[in-house]
Design a protein with these regions (language model features):
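Canonical positions in the second alpha-helix
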Residues: 231, 264-265
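Residue-level recognition of tetratricopeptide repeat
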Residues: 213-214, 247-248, 280-282
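Short coil turns that delineate tetratricopeptide repeat
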Residues: 236, 270-271
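N-terminal nucleophile
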Residues: 1-221, 229, 239
Length: 302
């Protein structure tokens, strides 16, 4: 039915969860994560309540194993559940009910737990564990690699449909919705893992865009330009990223290039002109002294 992995990155403290299933929109019920607290995967005959209940216990100082045991003990349907969680220290815990459907199992390791049920064949959890341990890069990259490894062993006996991946910061925040670094999901797709990988790249591009906009607001136009360029390298032609790039070009005084990019943006979708005018009029994209709005929208000479 489903395979998943929860993990903590020892270098950054980041926490994450990723999963795939031949089930519609598993991202709406299976993955749970809270910055500086933990990550939970609840699956099989899923009870979404395991997510917030376990996270609340972890936030209160209860360790992973005890948190899972407390929630499991209160669940009369525990034998059809499968759950994995990891806490902010990297301690992992998992449970597979006796009524979960074969091939079924879980594998815990240093800072992670992989779990699977209704698989096409054996070795799925072990493949996830090995791929997670061997893959370099960010936590999101390693989580996705674990999912790909699971699919290489046959994956869900019914096939593929949906996937999700969440990564949160290692430091706790005041509110549980804060500190989310990555939250992407595929609800219905013939190749959900490939689509999840594409969305991770889109998410990274937009993260760079957010960094660029923050730098521009802080008055660091050079950093804004570097961030916008990096984002566009990942996602060429994306309108929102082009808007950040234009703002950064204006900030560093490269007006002819900014005008050229404005023409490209407005040429593809004319209503962007109104958006950019509104941002400038409200001071969110400041123009250099002596440059007017109309001049910005005038094509550069030559």
């Amino acid at each position: 039915m489903t395979y998943s992995i929860v993990a903590r990155d020892p270098g950054t403290g980041q926490l994450g969860v990723a999963a795939q299933s031949c089930y519609f929109a598993l991202g709406s019920v299976l993955p749970w994560a809270r910055a500086g607290v933990g990550a939970v995967a609840t699956q099989s005959m899923v009870d979404p309540g395991y997510g917030p209940r376990c996270l609340d216990l972890l936030a209160g100082g209860v360790g992973a194993a005890e948190a899972l045991e407390r929630v499991r003990a209160a669940d009369e349907g525990r034998e059809v559940r499968q759950v994995g969680l990891v806490d902010a220290s990297g301690a992992a815990a998992s449970f597979t009910g006796s009524l979960c459907i074969d091939e079924v199992g879980h594998a815990e390791g240093d800072g992670f737990s992989a779990q699977a049920n209704m698989m096409a064949g054996p070795g799925v959890c072990e493949a996830m564990a090995a791929a997670f341990a061997a893959t370099p890069g960010s936590l999101a990259t390693r989580l996705l690699a674990a999912l790909v490894a699971a699919e290489s062993k046959g994956g869900d006996a019914r096939g593929q449909m949906s996937a999700a991946l969440i990564v949160v910061e290692g430091e706790r925040h005041e509110h549980p919705w804060e500190g989310v670094l990555t939250d992407v999901r595929v609800d219905h797709h013939p190749q959900p893992l490939a689509e999840l990988g594409r969305l991770l790249q889109v998410a990274e591009a937009y993260h760079l865009c957010d960094v660029a906009e923050g730098a521009l607001i802080a008055g660091d136009a050079a950093a804004a330009l570097a961030g916008a360029e990096a984002g566009l390298a990942l996602l060429p032609g994306e309108g929102n990223l082009l808007l950040s790039y234009i703002g950064a070009l204006i900030g560093v005084g490269r007006m002819d290039e900014a005008k050229a990019e404005v023409q490209k943006l407005v040429g593809v979708r004319p209503p962007w002109e109104g958006v950019l005018r509104a941002l400038i009029q409200r001071g969110l994209v400041p123009l250099p002294e002596g440059v007017t709005l109309d001049q910005l929208f005038t094509p550069p000479a030559g």
